[in-house]
């Protein structure tokens, strides 16, 4: 007896999705994405449309309200007296609110203007005058890049700044001098910022000194003074130096001023 052996045929390898299925899935994906985008755009359009409808409805209500007021004024019989009185009362309240808002704004603007009038800016900046070579109190002039904000500060006799309003003031001075000129003594050059209160004696607020130099030609040196002080109405401030003949009066060398804080 002869037994025959038959080897089973190998299984075929698994194949992928059919082409038709791939096309279907692709089209389905495109459809879903398109639908999502379309839904989002429609939602935006609907939202804007609803806002526009709401605005139109409000305008229509305002138009109807104004039309009703007009009909009440003309005395049409289609409206009862009670309705007209109620509508007129609402309209009068609306007008009163508008007028109150306008009055409040006017009061605020008036208050700001009064506040500005009560606290005006006070400032002065003057330049040295070359004629002040014989007196220890430096003289000044309203020339060049000077400042005199208003009549609440004045330059009196070309020597002192006088204020007419009480307050805190920043007062400053810059004095430039030629340090190697023949001085009357070997004492240092001293610049003083002085105060003359009304009906009181003068007093020194600030003082600075600088030594002489033997440099040739003229060795220019500058002294700076500055501080914050309380001034009364009618108070005056001025600058005093030990040797006015050494002071340099060129452009920007020597100046004096104040500013109300």
Curated annotation (Swiss-Prot):
Function according to Swiss-Prot or TrEMBL: Cytokine that acts as a ligand to CD40/TNFRSF5. Costimulates T-cell proliferation and cytokine production. Its cross-linking on T-cells generates a costimulatory signal which enhances the production of IL4 and IL10 in conjunction with the TCR/CD3 ligation and CD28 costimulation. Induces the activation of NF-kappa-B. Induces the activation of kinases MAPK8 and PAK2 in T-cells. Mediates B-cell proliferation in the absence of co-stimulus as well as IgE production in the presence of IL4. Involved in immunoglobulin class switching.
Disulfide bonds: 178-218
PTM comment: The soluble form derives from the membrane form by proteolytic processing.
Extracellular face of the membrane: 44-261
A Gene Ontology cellular-component term: cell surface
Cleavage, annotated site positions: 112-113
Keywords: Cell membrane, Cytokine, Disulfide bond, Glycoprotein, Membrane, Secreted, Signal-anchor, Transmembrane, Transmembrane helix
Any GO BP annotation: positive regulation of T cell proliferation
Glycoprotein recorded as keyword: yes
Major location (coarse): membrane
InterPro entries: CD40L, TNF_CS, TNF_dom, Tumour_necrosis_fac-like_dom
Glycosylation positions in this chain: 240
Protein name: CD40 ligand
